[in-house]
C-alpha cells in the first residue's frame, strides 16, 4: 500500500518526505516526553538518584550525543580542568540539562563554535554552554525560562526545554540562568553544589 502510494513521487521527493516525517515524529516524541516531565515535576513525583559522576566521561558522552546536530563548519568543544572532577549528582538529569542547552545552541549557531565548559568555584561547580550564534536579548533573560516561550518560530520546538531545565536544576539544588553580560552569542550557566544536601 505504502509503495503504491509513493509510486507517484520521485526518489528525491520520497526521500524529502521521509525526512519531514522523521523530523515531525521526533518533534512529537519530544513534546510528549517534555509534557510528561513537566507533569512529574509539578506533581512532585520526579525522583532523583544521586551517584558519583565522573564529569569528563559524562560531558564527552553528552557532546557525542549532539554532534550530529551541529552545522557544518561549527566547532563543538569541551573545556575542562586538568584534574578529574567527580560530582555527586543525578547523572541522567544533569545530562538532560546539558543536552537541552547544547541542542538549543546547535539550532541557533551556523558558524563559529559551541563550547561546553565546567569549573569549580568555591562550593559550587559551574557548567556553561556558550555559542557564537545570534544571541538573546538580555530583556528575555527570564522570559525564555517560561513554558512555551520560544526565541522565534523559525526553528522546531515547543518552548518547554528551558522550563524543564530550570525545574531539574532546582531539583538538583542549583540554579540556571542566561549570562546577559556575554555578547558574542548566547551563554547559559548552570551552578550546582559540589556537595548537595542529603
Region annotations inferred by a language model:
Residues 23-28:
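Short alpha-helical segment of the dimerization/phosphotransfer core of two-component systems
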